[in-house]
Amino acid sequence: MADLSSLKDLGTATEAAAPAHVRKVDSLGRSYATGKRKNAVARVWVKPGSGKIIVNGKEFAEYFARPVLQMILRQPIVAAARDGQFDIVATVAGGGLSGQAGAVRHGLSKALTYFEPGLRSVLKKGGFLTRDSRVVERKKYGKAKARRSFQFSKR
């Protein structure tokens, strides 16, 4: 490592060492990422196209029937102002529909940043690149649920 004699040298050395975000695209011109939420794991491929979104072989509006879930899935595209510019194919397994929608959203956000590194700051600011680590708390013995105690009778 270079001789660091001042704070200015330290600043330039750390800037040079910081990894630049590089575009990650496969031979077919697609970016791939995995997203997770609760117990759901989504594998997402993004490529330039007309704006089709396919989840587990179905149109996303058919797979996620509730409008709230559709909105959750489309949030990164809308935030990045790239509506109708990418074709998205996702396979998702595990968990329920809400967790699956969140997993696809997380994977889609990561895939968009791999395809177009300039979108990273916008998606990071929206909180789409952060893995939501909240999972169901385990049930404890001596309790009815995770925290709820059994009914107590004083007399």
Curated annotation (Swiss-Prot):
GO terms for biological process: translation. Keywords: Ribonucleoprotein, Ribosomal protein. GO terms for cellular component: cytosolic small ribosomal subunit. InterPro entries: Ribosomal_Su5_D2-typ_SF, Ribosomal_uS9, Ribosomal_uS9_bac/plastid, Ribosomal_uS9_CS, Ribsml_uS5_D2-typ_fold_subgr. One of its GO terms (molecular function) is structural constituent of ribosome. It comes from the Bacteria. Belongs to the universal ribosomal protein uS9 family. This is Small ribosomal subunit protein uS9. The gene is rpsI.
